Curated annotation (Swiss-Prot):
Keywords: Acyltransferase, Isoprene biosynthesis, Transferase
Organism the protein comes from: Pyrobaculum aerophilum (strain ATCC 51768 / DSM 7523 / JCM 9630 / CIP 104966 / NBRC 100827 / IM2)
Active-site residues, Swiss-Prot/TrEMBL: E82 (proton donor/acceptor), C114 (acyl-thioester intermediate), H236 (proton donor/acceptor)
Keyword Cytoplasm on entry: no
Pfam family, one: Thiolase_N
Name listed for the protein in its UniProt record: Hydroxymethylglutaryl-CoA synthase
Gene Ontology MF annotations: acetyl-CoA C-acetyltransferase activity; hydroxymethylglutaryl-CoA synthase activity
Catalytic reaction annotation: acetoacetyl-CoA + acetyl-CoA + H2O = (3S)-3-hydroxy-3-methylglutaryl-CoA + CoA + H(+)
Phylogenetic classification of the source organism: Archaea, Thermoproteota, Thermoprotei, Thermoproteales, Thermoproteaceae
Annotated positions binding (3S)-3-hydroxy-3-methylglutaryl-CoA: D30, C114, S155, T203, H236, R245, N268, S298
Length: 350
């Protein structure tokens, strides 16, 4: 029986961008210092008619188009997000109708901060491996928010990425998966609060690095992998510095990490962050390449996956679906006033 793996991928990045220097200008920060601290030059901003739902729909449509399969063959759809437009109403059920999926489908919105989308990947893999479904889909989508004037505003951005899992037409076979989770209060948002809070010193060592390194190193030790085995390594990207440092801690050369870095150009897309980097790598990967994917979610936890690219990757890369690199280049810059308007941050009270 053929291995389970990635059958297709799709991504969507809103074309609007705001430069770090524009945000810094408004708040009186030194733009050169801010860029140096976060290694984020600009970030993506959703338009007035976009939200986590529309972004998810577009990313998923592109994954379906690239796969060339009948949407009715999708047996499960999972959505990971921190930006639900509704407090009570799933995005996954909207995708069922928007994408033309069968009504006999498992549909769930997942929650685990920025790794909820990768939890959907784990769930889809499990259902396909069990034989319960033929294909499964996961989508990571967010229009992440940072409080005006707070440093999270420099990186919190918008985007979506989707993966389709199956046994037939696999472009990247799953070889291994590993998880590392603990109760770590690094980042949270209480009910009714418009913006999240973060635990300052908890966001680095106790949260991101402990769990990213724990998952990646744990996987390598359990399954006997070495850094030299991987052609590409993709980490969650809250800023430009963290994935670089994680690579250094694992003795992974930068040339294996750099191709999957997107945060410098679009900021932190939360649930789409690692999956977007993975999509960017799949756009250029060659048969035989091994890819290590390590998403992270605050609260906190990481999943680590190893995939091996198959001969079918070349065919999927010629599908005509926009690549991540295409979307990184397709952009329109806006100023801070337009940014506030598009993000619906201007509130009118009667």
């Amino acid at each position: 029986m053929s291995k389970v793996g990635i059958v297709s991928w799709g991504a969507y990045i809103p074309k609007y961008r705001i430069r770090t220097e524009e945000v810094a200008r408004i708040w009186g920060d030194d733009p050169l210092r801010i860029v140096d601290v976060y290694l984020v030059d600009e970030k993506s901003v959703e338009s007035l008619d976009e939200d986590a739902v529309t972004i998810a729909v577009e990313a998923a449509r592109r994954a379906l188009k690239r796969a060339g399969i009948n949407p009715k063959r999708i047996g499960a759809v999972y959505v990971g997000t921190e930006s639900k437009p509704y407090a009570v109403k799933p995005i996954s059920s909207i995708l069922v109708d928007a994408l033309g999926l069968s009504n006999n489908v498992f549909a769930v919105d997942m929650e685990f901060a920025c790794k909820a989308g990768s939890e959907g990947l784990v769930a889809a893999i499990g259902l396909v491996e069990s034989g319960r479904i033929e294909y499964g889909m996961t989508v990571g989508t967010d229009t992440s928010q940072g409080e005006p004037g707070e440093h999270l505003e420099y990186s919190a951005s918008s985007g979506g990425a989707s993966l389709i899992v199956g046994r037939d037409g696999v472009v990247a076979e799953l070889e291994a998966v590993y998880s590392y989770v603990s109760d770590t209060p690094d980042f949270w948002r209480r009910e009714g609060s418009p913006y999240p809070m973060h635990g300052e010193g908890f966001t680095g060592e106790p949260a991101y690095f402990r769990h990213i390194i724990g998952a990646a190193r744990g996987l390598m030790e359990r399954y006997g992998y070495k850094p030299s085995d991987f052609a590409y390594v993709v980490f969650h990207q809250p800023n430009g510095r963290f994935p670089v440092r994680a690579a250094s801690m694992l003795n992974i050369p930068m040339e294996k990490v750099k191709p999957g870095i997107v945060v410098t150009h679009i900021g932190n897309t939360y649930n789409a962050s690692a999956l977007m980097g993975f999509a960017k790598v799949l756009d250029i990967a060659k048969p035989g390449d091994k890819i290590l994917l390590v998403p992270f979610g605050s609260g906190a936890g990481s999943n680590a996956f190893v995939f091996t690219v198959t001969e079918l990757i070349t065919e999927r890369q010629k599908s005509g679906v926009p690549t991540v690199e295409d979307m990184l280049r397709d952009k329109i810059y806006i100023d801070y006033a337009q940014y506030l308007k598009m993000r619906k941050m201007i509130k009118l009270f009667e």
